[in-house]
Amino acid sequence: MTDLGLSASGSNVVQASSFDARYPPKCIVDGRMDTFWMATGLYPQQFVLKLPGLHILDRVSIQTYNVKDISIERTNSSEPVKFEPIAIKTLQHQTGKLQTETLSPQELTANYLRFRILSGHAPFVSVHRMSILGRETRTPISMDRPPSGEQGTRVIRNAAQPAGGPLVPPVA
């Protein structure tokens, strides 16, 4: 399985809400731990990742610093529009350590992923790296279709999530 969170796989950041030449958004997908994108204050902040075609998502992992609340959304569209929420998570602050959060969606497809940083533990947050494992497909999977035999992959109907809980959407 290819890591779709890397520019080497054909993925790229096509939109970011802030830009600092020293910490550009492209650092999110360069695969290096010594580079990162720094959001330049005020919330929400966001970036949109274009995948190299339609993929079934098996795992999405993101490494951040100072992020408090994050929303992960996807779209099957050929353009970065009409995003649907996958999960919302409140992250614990870890002074001097990166936060690593992993989502294991079941039967979800995406052409684009949008990561919205809704709030932070400090005025500035950073996104260091992401890893996205998935399989190429030609058939989009609708968010309205229930997963086959498994629970947990539905649109989030409310934003309240328990602190420290898994990065998995609740059953609607």
Pin down the residues of each PLM region.
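Disordered, acidic Ser/Thr/Pro-rich linker "stalks" and the adjacent N-terminal cap
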Residues: M1-P52, I141-A172
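Acidic/polar N-terminal loop/beta-strand segments that form early-domain functional surfaces
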Residues: F19, P52, Q63-Y65, T75
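Hydrophobic/aromatic beta-strand segments within beta-rich folds
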Residues: R32, Q46-L51, L57-I62, T100-R135
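Short, solvent-exposed aromatic-acidic interface loops
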Residues: Y65, Q92-H93, E150-Q151
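Short, surface-exposed beta-strand/strand-loop-strand elements in extracellular ectodomains
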Residues: V67-P85
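Extracellular carbohydrate recognition and processing domains
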Residues: F83-L103
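Structural alpha-beta junctions
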Residues: T137-T139
